[in-house]
Amino acid sequence: MRTISTIADLREALAEHRRAGRSIGLVPTMGYLHVGHMELVRRAGSENDVVVASIFVNPLQFGANEDLGKYPRDLARDQALLTDGGVDFLFAPGVSDMYPRPMETVVDVPKLGSELEGAVRPGHFAGVATVVTKLFNIVQPDRAYFGEKDFQQLQIIRRMVEDLAQPVTVIGVPTVREEDGLACSSRNVYLTTQERRAAAIVPKALDEAERLIASGVTEPAEVEKRVLEFLAGEPLARPEVVALRDPETLGPVSEIEEKPVLLLLFVRFGTTKLLDNRVIAPKSARFAKVA
């Protein structure tokens, strides 16, 4: 694996592969990799001739009081993991490489990006869309891989690609989980031992929603209310978003019928924010009662 830090060097390195007609897969990350990231790498390697992973802690997507300064970083560790994973190129630019002067151009998907997580993190998704667009312009991948754990982000990127006719296929990869069901996340390392134990309630809350829907609850507000009550059983959990939405548009759902619905959770434990979600198909819910 070759590590590259400048845009010009990466473009030059990829040009010969592009001329040879080789397909390129991109796995954008902020580093401090875990098994979820490595599943993205594995998928990219199975579907492309050349795999590029990027590591860049993007300041545009962090708010003034967020964790930019303490976001975990360990480039040597990440390089070893990516080498073992078969990545061909690691693009690891500095802030001055990506943003040599203050950005005047911002890519925003305002409707999708201002709700749910965007409502409690204003400007976050504009920062994401901007850096992802820049990475797409630099790498020019055939395919780009994102985890379904960040479902709102995934749908925003898909809409951005569609609206701007960007020549890349966006592929969502199912969430990888730890033994107790907690979604793998670089931010899990922030949790204290007590908070980590408490965080197991997040995937259990998704199970609870699926049970409710399988039992015949059709009012989204009722499901949301009861999931909030369920989360209230864990004193360390502070839910910020509990929302049932349409999985394609992220718009509100008036009633739970035959169409799948998406439950999005955004829960704080101490200073750590955890995201999770599940798409639930009412007729095939795992907890459906046997007739």
Swiss-Prot record:
Binding site for beta-alanine: 61
A GO biological process held by the record: pantothenate biosynthetic process
Pfam families: Pantoate_ligase
Subcellular location: Cytoplasm
Keyword tags: ATP-binding, Cytoplasm, Ligase, Nucleotide-binding, Pantothenate biosynthesis
EC number of this enzyme: 6.3.2.1
EC class name: ligase
Highest taxon, organism lineage: Bacteria
Binding site for ATP: 30-37, 147-150, 176, 184-187
Catalytic activity from the UniProt record: (R)-pantoate + beta-alanine + ATP = (R)-pantothenate + AMP + diphosphate + H(+)
Record pathway: Cofactor biosynthesis; (R)-pantothenate biosynthesis; (R)-pantothenate from (R)-pantoate and beta-alanine: step 1/1
Main location: cytoplasm
GO molecular function, one term: ATP binding
Signal peptide segment: none
Residues annotated as binding (R)-pantoate: 61, 153
Active site: 37
GO cellular component terms listed in the entry, alphabetical order: cytosol
Xref: HAMAP family: PanC
Additional free-text comment from the UniProt record: The reaction proceeds by a bi uni uni bi ping pong mechanism.
Subunit structure, as described in the record: Homodimer.
Family label: Belongs to the pantothenate synthetase family.
Function: Catalyzes the condensation of pantoate with beta-alanine in an ATP-dependent reaction via a pantoyl-adenylate intermediate.
Protein name: Pantothenate synthetase
Source organism (scientific name): Rhizobium meliloti (strain 1021)
